[in-house]
Amino acid sequence: MVPPVETKAMSKQNHPARWTLWTTVFCSFLLALFTPQLSRAQYKADHIPGFAGLESGTQAPPGIYVGDLVWIYPTSTIKDNDGNKVGNGSASLTSSLDVILGSVVTNYKIFGANYGTQVALPFIKNEIQLNSLDVSSSFAFSDMIVSPVVLGWHLKQADVMAGYNLYIPTGQFSATGTGNTGLGMWGNELTLGSTVHLDKTHSWNAAANFGLEFHSSKKDEDIKVGDIGTIEGGLSKTFYKKVSGPIPMITNVGLAGYSQFKITGDSGSDIPLFLQGYKDRVFALGPEINTFIPKPRLTLLFRYEPEFAARNRAQGQTILFSIAWVAKSLAKHP
């Protein structure tokens, strides 16, 4: 037993320590209470959902393609683990991205599939890092995407596509920065998708593509973003219009959607306590129209997908425009 006098002496000596402890706990509570835009929102992955939609399981015919894609994502909402809106909604953010695309689909066969490859050079403004709306960055180069292997099979009533995407941390990243244009980590993604033709004329199509993404630790931080699953696809109707020349104008109209969800939670000693043990998810659904114009060999696309049922992440709207040009056709005609 400790003598009473020594007990009082120890109590006086430990009082500053107890004060510091309770001050820390109280300040942590205030931080969690008055920084709602970060509440339980998870670290972002490389794959931005909504880049694929109708016929997402179909590889393009053999050829050399170049294109440009514009992605706009306005949001003023962060959802918590129960789906409730966090904060008063006064903050807002619009993240935007421009991607220069180049791809080649060859006649070379691997396991009966056409072999292809693709590279994407992205430029982003307001890169969302932690589903926080406290982001401000100028338009600058982001993390590069290389797809060294893309395989496409074309069956009688279905198409199948499989591939591998490598996300290279070429964008600006600082562990303490709010103006980053990259995520500061390497990403690897395996993809598998299919487009099923629902009638003999291939005018009705249902498609889905699944990507499994996993990551390295972030630069200068003991943080590893959890594995991510992304499903993108849609249901479409194809219309053909005769124009001058042998190839008709082809238009796809339909409903596109996506879901993205964390399969495993974020890990590492640098993850704040109030972010540990949670996983995020989101769904989106909306219209898409794309048209191939044969004479200039251009494909124009518009997709709009408002998000819903988000958990532990931002909930906004995906708006996407793209244009692709067939620089050279490599298709073999009988």
Regions found by a protein language model. Name each.
Residues 56, 68, 99-106, 146-151, ...:
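Residues on the lipid-exposed face of transmembrane beta-strands in outer-membrane beta-barrel proteins
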